[in-house]
Amino acid sequence: MVLFIRQLSGHQGKDTLGRRACGGNAEYPLMDTLTYEISSTAARLVVDEGLEYGPAKRRALKSLGLPARTPLPDNEAVEEAVREHIALFCADTQPGELAALRRLALVWMERLEGFRPHLGGAVWQGTATRLSDIHIQLFCDDPKSAEIALINQQVDYEVRAVNGFNGETVDALSLHARCPELGESVGVHLLVYDHDDLRGALKPDRRGRKPRGDLGAVRALLAEA
């Protein structure tokens, strides 16, 4: 087994990345270097290849020659590593790509305004690049109404079952939309929830951030850019 361990000089004391990935409240004198390597490798795969966090973490284990049962860092640790990777390698291109994806997301949210669309994922959180897909949650009175709307708009889409934000299985209506600013097609995934699910959808995460935003919130992000 080959491990790639970085020399972490000057990292004595508390370290939130290693502490959070282990899931406890203990304070470690040194960064968990193994967790850091997994997070950093996964972040590179997320940014450079467009992988989702789960597949990126599993592939990171293989890349580092680690056993499949090696504890994985949580998504917050990977997100922090993604932000570091973007700051180091994509700082000149990522902001424009993010804005283009948010504008495309806004177009689809406006097209489906009647279904209470909320933008989530990397495009909402600000870590998206041109390889990222757009994830929009719809909160419908009738779960089939969103499909009917797409059919009426003559939109080609595929239906697949995915895990929702509460761990339940929900339908995802997946399609490809042309992004003129990027000059290519982007994956757009419309996750269909019941209207009642909207109550818990806006609960802040552990950092106090909103996990998704409605039309007004997305417009505000674009106005700030």
Specify the residue positions occupied by each region the protein language model found.
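Catalytic core of pol beta-like nucleotidyltransferases
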Residues: 32-50, 57-130, 141-225
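Short hydrophobic/aromatic beta-strand micro-patches
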Residues: 135-141
